[in-house]
């Protein structure tokens, strides 16, 4: 199998090199890409081109590729090896010969529009991924964060999560349909991003506008506690010893059952921002307390109220 993977932007009529045109005109080649990619390149394909739309889940497309062991041309967005399908195809077809013709990826295009030093950015992809990579960039106090979005983790849901957990100290720079006729670049506060309209595909940069301290080993007195019961929490010495005993920096999931103030959950998340933290508490009053503490200390976590057995 021979794979040619071609990166394109949202430019209405992509300009291809003579080398790429040779691949498009080769005998027996089959084409694949997203529906949007087909709209952009259709006029440059042979009249009888065989095209497969790439959709999620990828299993049917990958099976079709296995059944045709000839030449494939796959279109992708930007740089196919930058969190793109090129990595998937190389993994799934290790014996195939592969050549890649990239263009600027969306984060590069947006950085050029904004004159941002993107080489210093912490890069996060939320495209079909969980929140933990963004959590880590925020907890680690990164000054510039580059984010690839999708139709679920949108600019507004990203802004909502950041505000919920106390990260209001960033400005959002948003790029939509970069490289095309509908291109739009905007600067938004996180509050503005909550209700703004967005065109897909988009990507964004988060630029820090104020620093916040990185907290680990938080004094007990700084936590909000149950009214009238200030001592009802796991004390700092016990928290830190327990988390060390659990080797929390090398774990992926934590269930904190009986979270109360959320002190264990919060310390764990700040020690290991990639940790998927779930806090369970039956007391109704703890809902607001855990939320306030998580926001104060910048610890993104999932809270489950009510009886643990039914959570």
Residue locations for each model-derived region?
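Class I S-adenosyl-L-methionine
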Residues: 1-101, 108, 274-284, 291, ...
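Conserved SAM-binding loop of SAM-dependent methyltransferases across substrates and taxa
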Residues: 261-273
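Conserved Rossmann-like nucleotide-cofactor binding loop
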Residues: 260, 285-286
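Conserved class I S-adenosyl-L-methionine
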Residues: 251-260
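Conserved alpha-helix/loop element of class I SAM-dependent methyltransferases that forms part
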Residues: 233-250
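Phosphate-coordination loops involved in phosphoryl transfer and adenosine-cofactor binding
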Residues: 142, 251, 274
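Short, glycine-/small-residue-rich phosphate/pyrophosphate-handling segment
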Residues: 106-141, 150
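A contiguous loop/helix-start segment that scaffolds small-molecule binding in enzyme catalytic cores
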Residues: 2-5, 17-19, 56, 70-72, ...
